[in-house]
Amino acid sequence: KKELPGAVAVLKRSFLSDAANQAELLLAATAESSDCALSVVEQPPLDGTKIALWAYLQTDVQTRVLPNGLYEVKHGVYRQLWMGGSFNRAANSEYQMRLLLNDYAMQLMEEGCTLADNCLRTWIFVQNVDCNYAGVVKARNEMFVTQNLTENTHYIASTGIGGGHADPKALVMLDAFAVAGLKPGQIKYLYARTHLNPTYEYGVSFERGTAG
């Protein structure tokens, strides 16, 4: 508090070395008192510690939990909408990813937003990524087409990486960030066509970065 006066957390992501044995205790200690989006993923910290915390803080904002589970962060004319740690237990990674994106799109609609116009960033954590990533890609590609997210419009900046959940049946986890109040054309998408080809050319659908 002394180093960052007035700052509040809007997202906390914990990286665990052994989610099956650590996640329940961690969530019990933090969930009830948390006023921000929480994400817990099994990715052993590189420095050898058992648990590491990544926190994103902001100042001069008002925060609250919305009825649909999203976390709202208001500043000026903008409303940031954060989601952390979403998962389900559908039969495989494709079905899980499809359900996660469909549910998230519905949450955004309740706030007058859409995936195409307002979602700026997703983080997708995939258990046993070598085996399950193909299902994630298929579900995302097919769902994005229904949301006017195509090679002719734009995609969403995203990280898709290996990461585990305390529940072995949870093959995919989703964190996401959207902003309500954006004007058409306000967001730009980062390209480096002289060095990197568009992602759709190798069968995936994400942007490498955004700028406002």
Spans of features found by a protein language model:
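N-terminal presequence-like segments and the immediate start of the first folded domain
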Residues: 1-212
